[in-house]
Amino acid sequence: MKKIKNRFIKLFMAICLVFVSVFAFTQANAISVVFAKTNTDSEYVNTITDLKTTNLMGGVTLYEQKMTSLLNGDKQKAFQEHFVQWVDLASYSNANVKLVTWTKQSMDNWTAATTKVCALDWEKNHPGWIVIAGTNGDFFSNSGDNTKEPTNNFMADGDMYRADYVGGYRGVVGINGDNTVVVGDPKLSSNMMLYIYDKDGNVAEKLPISGYNTAATSDGITLYTKDCKDTYDLTGYTVCEGVYTICRVSNGKNKTVFVKGEMGLSRPGKTAEKPYQTREEIEEDGTSKTITVREFYIATKNQEVVNKLKSGVKVKCQYDFVGEWQNVENSVGYIHQMLQNGTSLNQCSTDSFIYTDHPRTFIGFKEDGTPVLMVIDGRGSSTNPVKKGNYGVSLFEGAEIMKLAGCVNAYNLDGGGSSTLIARNENGGFDVINRPSDYGYERSTGNAIFLVMRDPAVETVSGRSSASTISIKKKTTDYAKSVTDIKVTVNGKTYEMESDEVIATGLLENTVYDVNVEYKLNGELCKSSYKASTNMYDPGVDINPTSKGFNIGLRQSDENLITSKVTIRVE
């Protein structure tokens, strides 16, 4: 009996050993299949489709391609597929293109809008400029208080909408006026600053603000906004009343504020002071109605300051960037850097935010500072045709793909249903290029980031162009009417637009050319560019019967005729 038991145990162990060996062999082979050699410079990324490129305005190029990538860069995982789309520039340092941020304008509160609506709003507030392409921006408050405010520091056009920042892995991309960037934790002034503007809109003076929505200081300047929770005794102070055009209060730890507006009357302070957004007004019949007043107060005992805040003077109250951040004009927050000096971070991460395959929006920069805006679709579903075959990526996969796009540094913007990439179309509107995971519909987000350029003020007349010429005419918009001294350069030859049209000649058939434009606006030299193409030459003939025979005509005549002889054979 004992021998039988021993034999059984040996047999059982042998079977187990065979099973383990077979399992290990099959697993090793499975991994070798999954992790086979890729067709890109990354061992974690494959391309499925050919790269589709579209030339946009200003030298910006749109790229679209379907790819697969190894989930989380983990060899125990599988390659998953997704659509990838991004925009960049061939030469950023010499380009007339700028990188900017924006939020849909609202006087009183934070607001959300789709990336397309935000682009239109940016153009509305920047006449003479156009958006070429862009994506959604920072994460924003869309649950809980649902304020729609960005969750990190945010500046647009030099206006510090939200001075609060988080820090650490939740950093900020700051964009300087010369298109260079600074990244990390922003450096801010210790005090808010009161900007006082002259009649031409230039900053005449900047003064430190000692406090806001708090008890006034006898030797300083105190700001009060509509969000002030308490009333304050301002007897002995002069209260300079203002009407704001924008007022924002952050819900961050510092509750920072931003105010922009115009000063009104100045008066002695009272015992219980507080500005309001709306007030109740009593009618002659005794009824009341609500009127919008949009008040802010500046309280001070300094008469020199009061004299500078005369009625009609425009002002701004905000924190400033300082140090290496002092030239930043636009900023946007991110959560996690993914690519650092050419090295992809977070491989095989155990942080679910990092390793989960989501739709993602990224901003990255090449060695020369050229920006790349990318969206990768995700949240694949067999029941949702928009998302089918789109799984999304971890941050490591995104870093590998951004590296393939030429980036050396990259950062993760808001993703999921927010991920949206838009591009300007030929009709002056915007197309959504990617496949948003909310069943193809754009989500409204807190802010956006765009590549923008000067409006060229001219356009191509395709019907008047030929196989060797491009017809360019001045636009009929109000902006175009305000510009002078237009010069157009095509293929190295410059044409002065003395009338409303010039024709670039001596060009090659069916060829794309850069159209470089210079003009003056109020004495300032402005530059812009776009691409235009010559037509395909049609060497055919048309034969039209008449009562006396046939009329034979060339379908297309040109200064450089390809067809010089026509032979007709009639059987």
Map each language-model feature to its residues.
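Sec-dependent N-terminal signal peptides of Gram-positive bacterial secreted proteins and lipoproteins
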Residues: 7-29
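Conserved, well-ordered active-site substructure
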Residues: 142-167, 171, 175, 331, ...
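Solvent-exposed loop/turn segments flanking beta-strands in beta-repeat/beta-sandwich domains
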Residues: 477-488, 559-567
